[in-house]
Amino acid sequence: VAAYGPLWNSGGERGIYKTTNGGKNWKRVLHISDHTGFNEVHLDPRNPDILYATSHQRQRKVWTYVSGGPESGLYKSLDGGENWIQLKNGIPGSDKGRFAIAISPVNPDVIYCMIEGHGFYKSLNRGASFNRESGHSTSGNYYVELFASPHDVNTIYSMDTYAQWSTDGGKSFKRLGEKGKHVDNHVAWIDPENPDHLILGCDGGLYETWDHASSWH
């Protein structure tokens, strides 16, 4: 699991944690610092020993919120989380905000990555290198979540105040329809048998569409 750590303080349980006995005991297998937590961990659907994790350096105080720093990044493990390498080829080297990634179910060699403050990136080789596709990114305090279509390798959904989607691998994004539903979207499910059947989770609850966002209930 990915652990962000305490909201208002440094330290605490931050990093990637692993259990091998159904949750009775946990071992921290990746840790950066007391100021940096982890917000996502993903498994390659073809090999459970291949994992990807995203770190986010942030500070939240009563008087300010700093979303980013040099310790935000993307990591990969080839041995079930025992050892990790940072993926840097094509990733900005300056201060970075929150990361989101999505592995394409159609072709798991393709990894999408959105970096707060930098844009939208794509890898065709399991993270060995990334190319910047566009400047699209969302607010790391609320969103920065991606969901790849199980039907088309070039279709990706980006959660935002108004949910957006791309059909060209992240080069451009357009809004989904929001008529009849609450905005502020955070999670999406795409039916693996029907690309027009979606469920979105937002601040107003769960909404379902059978006509690809033309109508919701």
Language-model features: locations:
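Beta-propeller blade termini and top-face loops
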Residues: 1-217
